[in-house]
């Protein structure tokens, strides 16, 4: 009997090829932590049969892989210069310069790099020939929207930061939805609601008049057609995949085309290298504390490093600290400095007692995944909002880097280590985070496949972006109701006055009788007229 198995296998293979898509990812030009997420996502997409391309500047370090390919272009940064630039920003912040000033400078570099990409005709023509099915935008660098428009390809947002932008279009009642960078929770008093409103207005003004116009000028410079505003491009996203989670985020209204996929990098702990395993195994009695401020913060200021070293040296626990730079003079004997460490594997070790961190989103999700309490010292960006949520959820303590003392840091560490409520809350949040349909990376690939299957999934998109400001806030309805109320007032006023005059007229006629013996002007005939006495009328014979 003839076997049809090879034919079925060939048919199945053909179906798989037909469903495969070409996807291009446009990561930000700096922040290696964002690139880690996209590499992980690209590998997951490869496993589902898709071909993924990362659009990166020349000289940016990334390990080669069969799971993705690279499209290089001459940009303003390579890995060395972008790291030096970022560290200079951190030194400026530590020296007292406003964080907002540094963020504006970062935005300027984003747009300069975007100008170089859009103006690179060889790059753009090469990308057009690829005929991509989908482009993934990281809104930290909005050039992805411009590239998608230039290529004429469907696009979706994958936000690697803790950011739920108003541009999504979801309702955001300021009474209980804290604005990004407000450092507020969903429980606000009057003054906090005032602050939240102020931050919201400043954010909208900043986006409308500072951020988006920079990219619009690039589109105008190169005469990109059809002409579109950045608002239209941002609103045109098929899907918004946000790196947050129900365990971390405050409950808020959302939309069908917004999905939470926070925790892409989380995974079970792997065995430690032999030298680290011996080190942590020697911390059986008191355990150990892990200290790391992420790949983006390599050099702390001397003042902060000394405060950390002093507080950590007073702990009975062992301490392992990811550290680069000059060794603090007051470093304790219990503290081990190391330039790189397997953070996830250490967080998953049974002897860990606490994590001292900058509050980076990837680090916090790994910490939550393993149920470890945390003390956070935010430095910039979404670190503050992330740690605000961690503290509000009872999983850790937030400290301000520019005001914290050695004693306060020591007390906070002792509190999260010795107070069991912090570990209990961390473990509960870990349960909530894991109790969802599939790992975050699998949920992400599912939704990417979904919008590919349904040609952008326009049925998920709300009509909020097709209505005007007046329609959204029902100002036209309010105007009509107000106008109706005013008209009703004048009509009722007119009718009331008319009825009053009629009644008064009838009453007046009844009072003006000329028959003897009846009232005339309210006075008995022949008695009084006004205040004086009057004569009787002559009798009629």
From Swiss-Prot:
Keyword Iron belongs to the record: no
GO BP: cytoskeleton organization; galactosylceramide biosynthetic process; glycolipid biosynthetic process; myelination; neuron projection morphogenesis; paranodal junction assembly; protein localization to paranode region of axon; response to immobilization stress
Membrane-protein topology: Single-pass membrane protein
Substrates-to-products reaction catalysed: an N-acylsphing-4-enine + UDP-alpha-D-galactose = a beta-D-galactosyl-(1<->1')-N-acylsphing-4-enine + UDP + H(+); N-(2-hydroxy-hexanoyl)-sphing-4-enine + UDP-alpha-D-galactose = N-(2-hydroxy-hexanoyl)-beta-D-galactosyl-sphing-4-enine + UDP + H(+); N-(2-hydroxy-hexanoyl)-sphinganine + UDP-alpha-D-galactose = N-(2-hydroxyhexanoyl)-beta-D-galactosylsphinganine + UDP + H(+); an N-acyl-sphingoid base + UDP-alpha-D-galactose = a D-galactosylceramide + UDP + H(+)
EC number(s) given by UniProt: 2.4.1.47
Gene3D superfamilies: Glycogen Phosphorylase B
Protein name: 2-hydroxyacylsphingosine 1-beta-galactosyltransferase
Annotated Pfam families: UDPGT
Pathway: Sphingolipid metabolism; galactosylceramide biosynthesis
Source organism phylogeny: Eukaryota, Metazoa, Chordata, Craniata, Vertebrata
Protein localization: Membrane; Endoplasmic reticulum
InterPro entries: UDP-glycosyltransferase, UDP_glucos_trans, UDP_glycos_trans_CS
Gene: Ugt8
Function: Catalyzes the transfer of galactose to ceramide, a key enzymatic step in the biosynthesis of galactocerebrosides, which are abundant sphingolipids of the myelin membrane of the central nervous system and peripheral nervous system. Galactosylates both hydroxy- and non-hydroxy fatty acid-containing ceramides and diglycerides.
């Amino acid at each position: 009997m003839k076997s049809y198995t090879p034919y079925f296998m060939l048919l199945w293979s053909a179906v798989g090829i037909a469903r495969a898509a070409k996807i291009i990812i446009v990561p930000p030009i700096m922040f290696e932590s964002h690139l880690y997420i996209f590499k992980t996502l690209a590998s997951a997409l490869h496993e589902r049969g898709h071909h993924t391309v990362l659009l990166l500047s020349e000289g940016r370090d990334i390990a080669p892989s069969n799971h993705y390919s690279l499209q290089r272009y001459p940009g303003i940064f390579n890995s060395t210069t972008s790291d030096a630039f970022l560290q200079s920003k951190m030194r400026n912040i530590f020296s007292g310069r406003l964080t907002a000033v540094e963020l504006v400078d970062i935005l300027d570099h984003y747009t300069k790099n975007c100008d170089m990409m859009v103006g690179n005709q060889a790059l753009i023509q090469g990308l057009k020939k690829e005929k991509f099915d989908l482009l993934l935008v990281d809104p930290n660098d909005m050039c992805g929207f411009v590239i998608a428009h230039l290529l004429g390809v469907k696009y979706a947002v994958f936000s690697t930061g803790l950011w739920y932008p108003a541009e999504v279009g979801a309702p955001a009642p300021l009474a209980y939805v804290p604005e990004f960078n407000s450092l507020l929770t969903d429980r606000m008093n009057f003054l906090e609601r005032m602050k939240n409103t102020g931050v919201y207005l400043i954010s909208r003004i900043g986006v409308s008049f500072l951020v988006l116009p920079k990219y619009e000028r690039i589109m105008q410079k190169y005469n990109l057609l059809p002409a579109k505003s950045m608002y239209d491009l941002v609103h045109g996203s098929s899907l918004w995949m946000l790196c947050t989670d129900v365990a971390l985020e405050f409950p808020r209204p959302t939309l069908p085309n917004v999905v939470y996929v926070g925790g892409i990098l989380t995974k079970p702990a792997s065995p430690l290298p032999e030298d680290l395993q011996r080190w942590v195994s020697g911390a059986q009695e008191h355990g150990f504390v892990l200290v790391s401020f992420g790949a983006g913060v390599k050099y702390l200021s001397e003042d902060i490093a000394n405060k950390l070293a002093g507080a950590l040296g007073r702990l009975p626990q062992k301490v392992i600290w990811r550290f680069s730079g000059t060794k603090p003079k007051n470093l304790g004997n219990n503290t081990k400095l190391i330039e790189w460490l397997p953070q996830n594997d250490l967080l998953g070790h049974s002897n860990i007692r606490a994590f001292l961190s900058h509050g980076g989103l990837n680090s916090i999700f790994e910490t939550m995944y393993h149920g470890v309490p945390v003390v956070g010292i935010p430095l910039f960006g979404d670190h503050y909002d992330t740690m605000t949520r961690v503290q509000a959820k009872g999983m850790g303590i937030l400290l301000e880097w520019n005001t914290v003392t050695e004693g306060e840091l020591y007390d906070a560490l002792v509190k999260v280590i010795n107070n069991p409520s912090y570990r209990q809350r961390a473990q509960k949040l870990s349960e909530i985070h894991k109790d969802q349909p599939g790992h975050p990376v699998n949920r992400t690939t599912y939704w990417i496949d979904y919008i590919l299957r349904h040609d952008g999934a326009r049925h998920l998109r709300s009509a909020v972006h097709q209505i005007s400001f007046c329609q959204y806030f029902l100002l036209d309805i309010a105007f009509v109701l107000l106008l109706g109320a005013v008209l009703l007032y004048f009509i009722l006023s007119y009718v009331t006055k008319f009825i009053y005059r009629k009644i008064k007229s009838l009453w007046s006629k009844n009072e003006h009788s000329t028959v003897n013996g009846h009232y005339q002007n309210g006075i008995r005939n022949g008695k009084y007229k006004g205040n004086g006495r009057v004569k009787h009328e002559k009798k009629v014979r």
